[in-house]
């Protein structure tokens, strides 16, 4: 294993933005959560203007990814390659730090079962729509992409060209 990975590469940022999109005004994310920018969930007390700039959306994304990064550094007990670190960042950005901390994905990862951990991504493809837990095609595509990034050969510099072609 090479140098210990402690930060995201552009692959994490690009894949997150690919699935979140950049919406420069508040909107409902499809499961009832008010969101703005590049998937930033508006928290109680946060106030935003009617419209934000792309640059501000990117700042929010970087702050949110910092939270995901901290969750990886706090919870993962095994060395990760860059693609694994990035894939977990995209995943945690979407599911949240608490869900990740209690996940079977993390348990398998920390047990050294990288293959088993990889197979857990797809189990997170559901959301509550009108109170009913339903498979969401967009989440399925996202989880497959996260899994592919997680499993990408560490020597591959630009795995996204094969993942989101």
Annotate each PLM feature.
Residues 1-31, 40-47, 52-65, 69, ...:
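Long, amphipathic alpha-helical surface segments
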Residues 16, 84-92, 120-122:
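Short alpha-helical scaffolding segments that buttress acidic/His motifs in well-ordered protein cores
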Residues 31-33, 85:
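Extracytoplasmic
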